[in-house]
Amino acid sequence: MKYTLVGNGRMGQQVLGAIEASGEHTVHDILDVDAEISEQSFSGSDVIVDFTVRDAFLVNLPAMLASRVPVVVGTTGWDREMSIVRSMVEKSGSSLLYSANFSLGVNVFLRTVREAARMIAPFEDFDIAFSEQHHTAKADFPSGTALRAAEMILEANSRKKSIISQLSTDRKIEPDELQVAAIRLGSVFGQHAAAINSESDDIVVSHTARNRKGFAGGAVQAGKWLAQKHTEQPGFYTMDDFLDEVLG
């Protein structure tokens, strides 16, 4: 399978390495984040993988969709445009799979957090909060993974109604608010944790990334799955769709 990479930064280089190490796929082309991209830029490709920045992704999206080559997106920071992007994908007849984090380990972690949030929901003495740490070069704050975890907690636990992630506030956090704390520190790859507390217990569900290989390998696997899915049913997909089908 031939991959075109949009973005040649740290994650782009990791995806390149994962493709070359697969023995199954090849890199068709690598496009820099500031390259002028058109529909023809993806001719001959089977899958596009985008690890750029929010603004570049949104500018390049129409050309990627017009090419009808399925797109795997790891670029974060465009959550507010999610409904617009989903509509664009559906109208184009192409396919796009988005995940804030393609690490299979992180996605196991997210599902564990969701289940823990569901299990404590009936017990009002249990509270839950979420935190994350990343390197100081990371642009979005909180991380896309943290926001996805927060959404999953709200879906699983009806006692939490909204997310609060401000750096400071002049009031206490209400019981129905889910606090999401973010720290930017040095060169930390990525740490996420859900903290659960009651009068008698402290429970911590956590994940620490040791390197970027897990993110890159998951993106390549998701691309292979999406290319097949595109021939059957084009549309907008997430990592949950991929895992649900793979895990049965």
Curated annotation (Swiss-Prot):
GO terms for cellular component: cytosol. GO terms for molecular function: 4-hydroxy-tetrahydrodipicolinate reductase; NAD binding; NADP binding; oxidoreductase activity, acting on CH or CH2 groups, NAD or NADP as acceptor. GO terms for biological process: diaminopimelate biosynthetic process; lysine biosynthetic process via diaminopimelate. It catalyses: (S)-2,3,4,5-tetrahydrodipicolinate + NAD(+) + H2O = (2S,4S)-4-hydroxy-2,3,4,5-tetrahydrodipicolinate + NADH + H(+); (S)-2,3,4,5-tetrahydrodipicolinate + NADP(+) + H2O = (2S,4S)-4-hydroxy-2,3,4,5-tetrahydrodipicolinate + NADPH + H(+). It is found in: Cytoplasm. The keyword Magnesium does not apply. Catalyzes the conversion of 4-hydroxy-tetrahydrodipicolinate (HTPA) to tetrahydrodipicolinate. Keywords: Amino-acid biosynthesis, Cytoplasm, Diaminopimelate biosynthesis, Lysine biosynthesis, NAD, NADP, Oxidoreductase. NAD(+) binds at G74, T75, T76, S99, A100, N101, F102. Pfam families: DapB_C, DapB_N. Belongs to the DapB family. (S)-2,3,4,5-tetrahydrodipicolinate binds at H135, G144, T145. Its EC number is 1.17.1.8. The active site is at H134 (proton donor/acceptor), K138 (proton donor). The keyword Ion transport does not apply. InterPro entries: DapB_C (IPR022663), DapB_N (IPR000846), DHDPR_bac (IPR023940), NAD(P)-bd_dom_sf (IPR036291). This is 4-hydroxy-tetrahydrodipicolinate reductase. Pathway: Amino-acid biosynthesis; L-lysine biosynthesis via DAP pathway; (S)-tetrahydrodipicolinate from L-aspartate: step 4/4.
